[in-house]
């Protein structure tokens, strides 16, 4: 329980953060729309890339700290009940594509929406009004529904809805099934092959479909969206760690990004370093692995029209790196996939590192960058990353019986990869 001094300290911290936020988001204070992005909160502006972002995150952190400090058992239970119902409502709205039926500007009759999707009007009213309690949608007048800034963002950026649907369909059922999975593993059923079967059962139970060519790509897309937006896994998009490219500014050096799951990082870096050549290697879709016919379909290289210096090609994970004259190799941290991954993250990473030994031997000046998540050491505390780290850790446990290696383990792994002619050396972390 907070004492008076602690409460006053946290209150001052919150007020200071709020002051910073209002200074960086004037349009949200005076009610103007200048600088606002459609589908975003008025506190999010086109310039929210630095101080404004940090100020908003600080406000949310302070509020969360106060809530944890002041909440009692009843508050916690009511909050969990609310979040459960909100997730159920969001899944329902997504299943029936309700957000897409509502114009981004203006409103729609709830009766018309109900007729369009074929559900009772009273049913959709009850769901919409629960969602409104969290700022998702709004009812400008009785019987009409309109987008709020929050719900509009789920339309303008479908990845948010992908993350929410995976959370509802896959993550939550698996999390609630954790006691029975623990009992099975404790009883000696912890072999990875059994875990893969369990994961397939979880996914098939929730999706009512097998992991075929149609279902698997969608599931992969939703899984990666959930990891990015639901667990704070930003390894695939972070660019601030790629400081080694500064020395190649103005040259025509080649940069290879291995295991990319999106083009976000490549496009950001291409804009920052317009003379560099970027080769983006995407892993073969899981549905194509092991099938010669399907693999041939992906055996091609394509250019990105908007960025002439970016080319994309497919590559099977762990195969020897064929681009042997690059200045920099960016290795994306491998991620498990429920029901598909057959070896641990550490094993996948070691295989990928060994696949690059020959390329680095031929180009001794080349640099290899591993984009690892910000996983704290055991016992380390930090409210900024601790919650998301624990969410991600449990998601890996429940869905793939895996975990992220700690920083010390990664360094030991890197130092241990080599052959008779040399080994990796960590020069910066």
UniProtKB/Swiss-Prot annotation:
Looking at the keywords, is Nucleus present? Answer: yes
The name this protein carries in UniProt is Transcriptional coactivator AacuS
Domain (HTH iclR-type): residue spans on this chain: 80-144
GO molecular-function terms, A-Z: DNA binding
Origin organism of this chain?
A: Aspergillus aculeatus (strain ATCC 16872 / CBS 172.66 / WB 5094)
Instruction: Write the signal peptide boundaries.
Output: none
* DNA-binding region, residues: 110-129
Name the principal localization, coarsely classed: nucleus
List the InterPro entries. Answer: SAM-dependent_MTases_sf, WH-like_DNA-bd_sf, WH_DNA-bd_sf
Q: Which SUPFAM superfamilies match?
A: Winged helix' DNA-binding domain (SSF46785)
Localization terms from the record: Nucleus
């Amino acid at each position: 329980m907070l004492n008076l001094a602690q409460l006053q300290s946290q209150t001052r911290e919150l007020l200071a953060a709020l002051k910073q936020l209002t200074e960086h988001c004037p349009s949200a204070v005076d009610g103007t729309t200048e600088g606002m992005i459609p589908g975003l909160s008025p506190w999010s502006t086109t310039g929210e890339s630095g101080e404004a972002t940090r100020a908003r995150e600080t406000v949310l952190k302070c509020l969360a700290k106060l809530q944890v400090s002041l909440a009692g058992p009843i508050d916690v239970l009511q909050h969990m009940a609310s979040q459960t119902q909100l997730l159920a409502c969001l899944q329902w709205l997504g299943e029936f594509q309700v957000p897409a039926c509502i114009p981004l500007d203006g409103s729609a009759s709830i009766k018309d929406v109900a007729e369009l999707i074929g559900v009772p009007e009273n049913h959709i009213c009850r769901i919409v009004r629960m969602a409104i309690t969290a700022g998702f949608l709004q009812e400008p007048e009785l019987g009409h529904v309109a987008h709020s800034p929050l719900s509009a963002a789920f339309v303008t950026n479908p990845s948010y809805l992908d993350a929410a649907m995976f959370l509802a369909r896959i993550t939550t059922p698996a999390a609630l099934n954790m006691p029975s999975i623990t009992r099975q593993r404790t009883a000696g059923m912890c072999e990875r092959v059994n875990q893969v079967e369990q994961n397939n059962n979880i996914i098939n139970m929730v999706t009512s479909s097998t992991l075929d060519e149609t279902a698997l790509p969608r599931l992969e897309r939703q899984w990666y969206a959930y990891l990015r937006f639901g667990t704070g896994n930003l390894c695939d998009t972070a660019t601030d760690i790629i400081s080694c490219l500064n020395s190649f500014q103005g040259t025509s050096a080649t940069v290879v990004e291995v295991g990319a799951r999106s083009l976000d990082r490549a496009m950001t870096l291409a804009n920052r370093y317009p003379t560099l050549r970027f080769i983006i290697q995407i892993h073969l879709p899981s549905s194509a692995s092991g099938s010669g016919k399907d693999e041939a379909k992906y055996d091609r290289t394509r250019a990105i029209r908007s960025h002439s210096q970016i080319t994309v090609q497919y590559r099977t994970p762990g195969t020897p790196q064929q681009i042997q004259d690059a200045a920099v190799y960016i290795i994306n941290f491998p991620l498990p996939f429920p029901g598909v991954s057959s070896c641990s993250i550490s094993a996948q990473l070691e295989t990928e590192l060994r696949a690059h030994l020959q390329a680095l031997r031929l180009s001794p000046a080349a640099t290899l960058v591993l984009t690892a998540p910000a996983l704290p050491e055991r016992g380390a505390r930090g409210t900024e990353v601790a919650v998301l780290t624990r969410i991600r850790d449990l998601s890996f446990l429940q869905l793939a019986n895996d975990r992220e290696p700690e920083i010390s383990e990664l360094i030991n792994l890197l130092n241990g990869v080599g052959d008779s002619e040399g080994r990796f050396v960590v020069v910066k972390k």
